[in-house]
C-alpha cells in the first residue's frame, strides 16, 4: 500500500513536470510566446485584490462631486481602458500558464467565484483555463473547471465551466483510463441530471 502511494505520487509529480515542460515549449513559439510575454507580469495571488480595486475606484469616481460630469466621464473611460488591459493580461497569463499548485488553484477559484468580480471577467478567466487545459492537459485545471461548475452561483459562469470541462475532456483521450477522470465523468453525469435546466 505504501509502495502504491509512492508510485502514485511519483507519477503525479512527473505529470506536473511534463505539463510545465510542454507549456514552456509551446510558449517559445507562435501566439503562446506573445501570450506568455504579455501575461508574465501578472501575479495570480494579486488578481482578485486588483480586480476589486477597479470596482472600488469606479464607485469612488462617481461619488466624487468635485469632478464635473465631463471629467467623470473622461476618468471613467481611462479607468475602463486600464481595466480592459489588465483583464487581457490575466487572460494571457492563465492561457500560457503551466502547472498550478493547490494554493494557486484555490486563489483562482476564489477569484472566479467572488461576488465582487463581475460575471464577464469570471467567464473570461474560465475560458482562459479551458484553453490552457485543452492545449496542454492538466488534471488540476480540469478539476478546477469542475469545481467552478459545481460551486458557481452565476449560471453563465456555471455553463462556461461545464462547457470548458467537456471541451477539455474531449481533448484528453489518453486520460480516459485515469481513475480521477472516470470518477469526475460519473459525478458530472449525475450533476447534469440535477441541473438539466441549465443545459
PLM regions: where:
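Short secondary-structure junctions and interdomain/linker hinges
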Residues: 21, 28, 132, 191-195
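Extended, helix-rich scaffolding/adaptor regions
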Residues: 1-69, 81-85
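Long alpha-helical HEAT/HEAT-like repeat alpha-solenoid scaffolds in very large eukaryotic proteins
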Residues: 178-199
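Alpha-helical solenoid scaffolds in large eukaryotic transport, assembly, and signaling factors
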Residues: 46-152, 158, 164, 168-177
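Alpha-helical solenoid repeat scaffolds
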Residues: 9-16, 32-37, 123-129, 159-170, ...
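The canonical alpha-helical register within tetratricopeptide repeats
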Residues: 9, 16, 144-151, 184
Amino acid at each position: 500500500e505504501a509502495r502504491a502511494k509512492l508510485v502514485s505520487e511519483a507519477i503525479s509529480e512527473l505529470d506536473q513536470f511534463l505539463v510545465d515542460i510542454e507549456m514552456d515549449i509551446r510558449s517559445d513559439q507562435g501566439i503562446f510566446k506573445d501570450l506568455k510575454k504579455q501575461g508574465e507580469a501578472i501575479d495570480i495571488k494579486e488578481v482578485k485584490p486588483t480586480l476589486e480595486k477597479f470596482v472600488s475606484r469606479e464607485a469612488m469616481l462617481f461619488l466624487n462631486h468635485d469632478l464635473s460630469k465631463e471629467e467623470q466621464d473622461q476618468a471613467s473611460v481611462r479607468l475602463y481602458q486600464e481595466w480592459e488591459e489588465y483583464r487581457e493580461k490575466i487572460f494571457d497569463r492563465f492561457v500560457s500558464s503551466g502547472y498550478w499548485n493547490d494554493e494557486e488553484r484555490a486563489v483562482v477559484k476564489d477569484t472566479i467565484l467572488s461576488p465582487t468580480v463581475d460575471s464577464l471577467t469570471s467567464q473570461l478567466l474560465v475560458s482562459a483555463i479551458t484553453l490552457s487545459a485543452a492545449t496542454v492537459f492538466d488534471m488540476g485545471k480540469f478539476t478546477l473547471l469542475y469545481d467552478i461548475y459545481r460551486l458557481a452561483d452565476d449560471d453563465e459562469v456555471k455553463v462556461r465551466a461545464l462547457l470548458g470541462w467537456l471541451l477539455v475532456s474531449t481533448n484528453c483521450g489518453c486520460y480516459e483510463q485515469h481513475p480521477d477522470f472516470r470518477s469526475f465523468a460519473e459525478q458530472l453525469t449525475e450533476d447534469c441530471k440535477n441541473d438539466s435546466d441549465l443545459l
